[in-house]
Amino acid sequence: MIRKDAKRSALVLFSGGQDSATCLAWALERYETVETLGFDYGQRHRVELECREGFRNAVARAFPAWAERLGDDHMIDLSVLGAISDTAMTREIEIEATANGLPNTFVPGRNLMFMTIAAAIAYRRGLQVLVGGMCETDFSGYPDCRDDTMKALQVALNLGMDTRVLLETPLMWLDKGDTWRLAHQLGGDELVELVRVETHTCYVGERAELHAWGFGCGECPACRLRKRGYEAYLSGEKVTEAPV
């Protein structure tokens, strides 16, 4: 059961991927008004960004009650982040582990910048809650996806803006199978199908082939994790190890 908080309004960091789409549905079920925020930071492809409008429109058609709560969409040009980042998310380079153990898909400072800009927009728009799809359980180990990071950032933003914005991360302790299950809990098979078809996760931007779990190359870490999560969702298992 999702506890509704009808007195609050939220801003969802919405990239067009599976996790942020599930968070959008979570927020639409919970809050009175929900706006969305995306960033163009010089990603190596724009496929995920191009999915944003399609998913918003599809959700509004499929769930009339949510359509009434779905507010404005905001797109921010953050190309400076791509200009200062040398990662597999912003360059056409092979995806691999780095010397510090993190995959080279990690974009330093990305979520810190995203949340700071989101907080500034929320301040101006009178929104009380920021919702992000960060989690500690997807095996990537990104430090800016950790619960401690988000809690510290909430304190810093509230001190720096003299406000009381709340940072919500509904996927923080869920594995990818649990994320599919949450989508089903929120909107049944219809929402699961929208997430499967209308969102994009693949690091290389492949959208030519529709697999059981969605579009993608099927080989990059993001595709393998999404596939493993979907299989775990169908079987009722937990995703207890990194997919290979």
Curated annotation (Swiss-Prot):
Its EC number is 6.3.4.20. Catalyzes the ATP-dependent conversion of 7-carboxy-7-deazaguanine (CDG) to 7-cyano-7-deazaguanine (preQ(0)). Belongs to the QueC family. This is 7-cyano-7-deazaguanine synthase. It catalyses: 7-carboxy-7-deazaguanine + NH4(+) + ATP = 7-cyano-7-deazaguanine + ADP + phosphate + H2O + H(+). The lineage of its organism: Bacteria, Pseudomonadati, Pseudomonadota, Betaproteobacteria, Burkholderiales. It is an enzyme of class 6 (ligase). ATP binds at residues 14-24. The keyword Transferase does not apply. GO terms for molecular function: ATP binding; ligase activity, forming carbon-nitrogen bonds; zinc ion binding. Binds 1 zinc ion per subunit. Keywords: ATP-binding, Ligase, Metal-binding, Nucleotide-binding, Queuosine biosynthesis, Zinc. InterPro entries: QueC, Rossmann-like_a/b/a_fold. Pathway: Purine metabolism; 7-cyano-7-deazaguanine biosynthesis. It holds the Pfam family QueC. GO terms for biological process: queuosine biosynthetic process. It comes from Paraburkholderia phytofirmans (strain DSM 17436 / LMG 22146 / PsJN) (Burkholderia phytofirmans). It comes from the Bacteria. Zn(2+) binds at residues 202, 217, 220, 223. Its cofactor is Zn(2+).
